[in-house]
């Protein structure tokens, strides 16, 4: 009996320790691949989406590839930001569209955590640049380990004058063919403006950039970052 109680104590302690190591997600990101319909332009897509009556989510962004990873010429990503799964489940609405089509059957759901202290993405603008890098958590490590190392890196960059907002997103629902569950992450950086992110990239390229996984991050198989131009479609808070 004492052994069972001791085991339960250890399990409870380990869960509490994990909870203290990593903050809860700041938001839920639901990402969907979308395509501009024949005869339409991306500008028309943005105009149509901005005129739609969408009151449920916190924010909606359309991200158009600039330096993508094999994206089709008419492809873009719709990112819808919610508080959590309950917020999504009680407010989600698929609005009919004319100028674009989205693959709503293959949405991906990401627990999103903000890194560092910068919170000034899209500062005075509704368009900015975003980089995203896909990585996989190393076996034997957790999102808490990844968060801590990435957060330390973000704080160090901010101390050097970096104005970008950094995030790490952790996939928990959606397509992830050929990988272990809950290992896929995206490291995201959003500029306070297009020029702001460009300056940040210039600063990173001034020194010894290195190769492979970001230094001290317990992740593997990191891809080169993709660059998108991100348009605010709606912000409800």
Question: Where are each of the predicted segments found?
Answer:
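Sec-dependent N-terminal signal peptides
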Residues: 4-13
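C-terminal segment of classical bacterial N-terminal signal peptides
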Residues: 13-19
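Short S/T/G/P-rich N-terminal loop/turn motif that feeds into the first structured element of a domain
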Residues: 19-237
């Amino acid at each position: 009996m004492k052994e069972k109680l001791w085991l339960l104590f250890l399990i409870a302690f380990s869960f509490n320790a994990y909870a203290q190591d990593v903050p809860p997600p700041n938001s839920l990101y639901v990402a969907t691949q979308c395509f501009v319909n024949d005869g339409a332009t991306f500008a028309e897509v943005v105009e149509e989406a901005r005129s739609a009556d969408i009151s449920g989510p916190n924010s909606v962004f359309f991200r158009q590839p600039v330096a993508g990873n094999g994206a089709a010429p008419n492809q873009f990503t719709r990112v819808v930001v919610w508080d959590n799964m309950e917020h999504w489940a009680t407010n989600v609405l698929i609005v009919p569209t004319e100028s674009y089509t989205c693959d709503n059957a293959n949405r991906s759901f990401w627990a999103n955590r903000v890194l560092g202290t910068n919170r000034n993405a899209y500062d005075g603008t509704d368009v900015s640049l975003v980089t995203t890098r896909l990585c996989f958590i190393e076996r034997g490590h957790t999102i808490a380990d990844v968060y801590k190392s990435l957060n330390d890196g973000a704080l160090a960059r901010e101390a050097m004058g970096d104005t970008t907002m950094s995030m790490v997103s952790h996939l928990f629902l959606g397509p992830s063919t050929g990988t272990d569950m809950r290992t896929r992450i995206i490291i995201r950086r959003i500029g306070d403006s297009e020029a702001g992110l460009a300056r940040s990239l210039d600063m990173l390229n001034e020194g010894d950039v290195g190769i492979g996984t970001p230094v001290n991050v317990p992740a593997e198989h990191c891809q080169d970052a993709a660059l998108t131009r991100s348009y605010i479609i709606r912000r409800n808070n």
